[in-house]
Amino acid sequence: MLHTLHRSPWLTDFAALLRLLSEGDELLLLQDGVTAAVDGNRYLESLRNAPIKVYALNEDLIARGLTGQISNDIIPIDYTDFVRLTVKHTSQLAW
């Protein structure tokens, strides 16, 4: 399943998101959700421990001035890769 987090993790039921993640799921951080990718924040450690791959939309990282601040565990992607993820996952859940 593809999970997309478009809101700040501080304004989301992040605990519920973590509970619903399963091995093989993927999470895309976009819009204000990219703030979860910033190195040193409390949400990043939970994402590191989850059995998933985590991506962040590069355009949103740039727009928020975060490109130099994200964890190496987060995979920056462009819109083409975003489309590939949506094609790959028939089930999606937006947060």
Curated annotation (Swiss-Prot):
Cellular localization per UniProt: Cytoplasm
Keywords from the UniProt entry: Cytoplasm, tRNA processing
Gene3D superfamilies assigned: DsrEFH-like
Main location, first listed in the record: cytoplasm
Keyword presence, tRNA-binding: no
InterPro entries: DsrEFH-like, Sulphur_relay_TusB, Sulphur_relay_TusB/DsrH
An example Gene Ontology CC term for this record: sulfurtransferase complex
Keyword Cytoplasm among UniProt keywords: yes
Annotated GO biological process: tRNA wobble position uridine thiolation
A Pfam family matched in the record: DsrH
Stated family: Belongs to the DsrH/TusB family.
Subunit structure comment from the entry: Heterohexamer, formed by a dimer of trimers. The hexameric TusBCD complex contains 2 copies each of TusB, TusC and TusD. The TusBCD complex interacts with TusE.
Function recorded in the entry: Part of a sulfur-relay system required for 2-thiolation of 5-methylaminomethyl-2-thiouridine (mnm(5)s(2)U) at tRNA wobble positions.
Protein name as it appears in the record: Protein TusB
Gene this protein is translated from: tusB
